[in-house]
């Protein structure tokens, strides 16, 4: 049997375009904010519609992608998950941290549509992605419920730190500055508490970029208050 090489070259097959130009505010996992819309545009080499034949019959897909916004040359065998307060160390392979030997991410997203565009070929319209704008995609696979869903799976430390939801208050005048098509997604992102898990100062004003807007907010207890929204 031929021995497999110790290293391989991955080819970027596509890039995803989302509402997040920076890492701050991106949901901690895919599917938490299904209103988030993304577009996957293939590189010129992989714009052959035949490669997507049959994919329209699946409701969800897996994306294999690169943590392009958090690349490090070195990796650590242990990391400190933000969901544990940033103080407890856990083995890197027991987390989804980007600081791993191969900085690859895996996300399950809803496949809403496949569009054919004359300038870029087939485009996948997805919902619920937890990726930064421009993230390179290395592979796409169909989500297969009977094989991929494990209702009785143990969830480790994540079961102790489930994502909580905040009540979002935004003055109507500010809310009207948000395009109607983006409001539900922004509401979902804010409700899922985009702050780092270890920051709880009610006086601190946080800022995040979303869909061409800069949103400033504070969080006091279980309520998030939008303080300002400006056009970038």
Question: What does each model-identified segment do?
Answer:
Residues 1-104, 116-125, 129-232:
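Mixed-charge, low-complexity intrinsically disordered regions
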């Amino acid at each position: 049997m031929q021995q497999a090489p110790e290293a391989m070259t991955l080819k970027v097959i596509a890039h995803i375009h989302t509402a997040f130009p920076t890492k701050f505010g991106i949901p901690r996992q895919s599917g938490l904010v299904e209103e988030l819309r993304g577009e996957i545009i293939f590189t010129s080499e992989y714009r052959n519609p035949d490669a997507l034949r049959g994919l329209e019959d699946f409701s969800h897909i897996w994306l294999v992608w690169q943590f392009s916004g958090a690349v490090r040359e070195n990796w650590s065998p242990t990391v400190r998950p933000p969901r544990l307060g940033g103080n407890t160390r856990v083995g890197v392979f027991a987390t989804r941290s980007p600081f791993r030997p191969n900085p690859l991410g895996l996300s399950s997203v809803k496949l809403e549509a496949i569009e054919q565009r004359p300038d870029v070929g087939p485009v996948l319209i997805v919902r619920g992605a937890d990726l930064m704008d421009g993230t390179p995609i290395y592979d796409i696979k169909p989500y297969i419920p009977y094989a991929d869903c494990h209702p009785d799976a143990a969830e480790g430390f994540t079961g102790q730190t489930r994502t909580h939801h905040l009540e979002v208050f935004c003055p109507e005048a500010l809310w009207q500055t948000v395009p109607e098509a983006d409001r539900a997604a922004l509401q979902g992102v804010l409700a899922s508490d985009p702050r780092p898990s270890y920051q709880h100062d009610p006086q601190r004003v946080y800022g995040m970029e979303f869909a061409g807007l800069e949103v400033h907010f504070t969080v006091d207890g279980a309520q998030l208050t939008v303080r300002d929204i400006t056009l970038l």
